[in-house]
Regions:
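C-terminal helicase lobe
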Residues: 3-176, 182
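Short linear regulatory motifs embedded in intrinsically disordered, acidic Ser/Thr-rich regions
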Residues: 242-251
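Short intrinsically disordered, low-complexity coil segments enriched in acidic
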Residues: 1-4, 221-222
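Short, amphipathic alpha-helical interaction segments positioned at domain boundaries
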Residues: 51, 56, 208-238
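Minor-groove-contacting beta-hairpin "wing" of winged helix-turn-helix DNA-binding domains
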Residues: 41, 199-209
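A short, conserved structural fragment
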Residues: 83, 183-199
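Active-site lining segments that contact anionic ligands and/or coordinate catalytic metals
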Residues: 78, 98, 189, 203-204
């Protein structure tokens, strides 16, 4: 990014970077004139597997990617603190943020009608997910990609029942976003792991059980931001038809 311009007001990532070092460099293009600027990062579950296939051959590629994913999915800690900690800067504290990041802003405004931060004990859900992966590999001789695993979890009655209890949703079906967050969290904490299959034309990422993790009773609590409002979503069919009703707004 050869941008020699001091008054950049926005840096927008439509996808995650491969590492926090890269993201720090790229977002650092904003606000070099000492005035405030916004850095917006758009993250989705498929980014993890797309980027993992790109960095799988690098010695520290996956470890650095997991740091980046942890930054993206953390709903609680200060964003700047996460960057500083992972880059070895111990001088920065959350108080220095001054509510500049979304997590610090959320805690300062305390809008409980919009979202609630909860800590989830995932032992039972992790066991059910591992059993699902084991059953698929044993009975169907099938390896599961990340998106396919989410599809299976949303259709599995046992996993749905466990998730409803964890989220205190007795009747409402848990959203796909919850399972995506859970699998991402399990991968970066190595409760599950990625298995790569190399072809002449591509690298395919599969999610498999981590046999090195035997004791599921002492896993960390998973922080999750539970939305208290029904989000409005635009859905596109399999042919990815263009939505013509969307109004175009001129920001200039």
């Amino acid at each position: 990014m050869g941008i020699d311009k001091a008054d950049v007001r926005f840096v927008i990532h439509f996808s995650s970077s491969k590492s926090l070092e890269n993201y720090y460099q790229e977002s650092g293009r904003a606000g070099r004139d000492s005035n405030s600027a916004d850095c917006i990062l758009m993250w989705r579950f498929s980014d993890l597997f797309r980027l993992a296939s790109m960095v799988s051959s690098e010695r520290t590629g996956i470890a650095k990617l997991y740091q980046m994913v942890g930054y993206c999915i953390d709903p609680n800690k200060c964003r700047r603190y996460l960057i500083s900690k992972n880059l070895g800067d111990t001088s920065w504290s959350t108080d220095d943020c001054k509510n500049a990041c979304d997590n610090c802003q959320r805690k300062s405004t305390n809008k409980s009608d919009v979202s609630t931060l909860i800590q989830i004990k995932t032992n039972e859900l992790l066991n059910a997910t591992k059993q699902l992966l084991f059953d698929q590999s044993l009975t169907k001789q099938e390896r599961i990609t990340g998106p396919k695993l989410i599809d299976l979890m949303t259709c599995n009655k046992q996993i749905q029942s466990i998730s409803q209890k964890l989220l205190n949703k007795n009747q409402e079906k848990p959203e796909r976003q919850f399972y995506e967050h859970f699998i991402s969290w399990c991968l970066i904490h190595q409760y599950l792991k990625l298995d790569f299959h190399f072809t002449p034309y591509s690298t395919v990422c599969y999610v498999v059980n981590n046999d090195n993790i035997v004791d599921n009773e002492h896993i960390e609590l998973m922080p999750y931001l539970l939305s208290n409002k029904k989000e409005e979503c635009f859905h596109v069919d399999a042919k990815r038809k263009r939505i013509h009703s969307t109004e175009i707004v001129d920001l200039t």
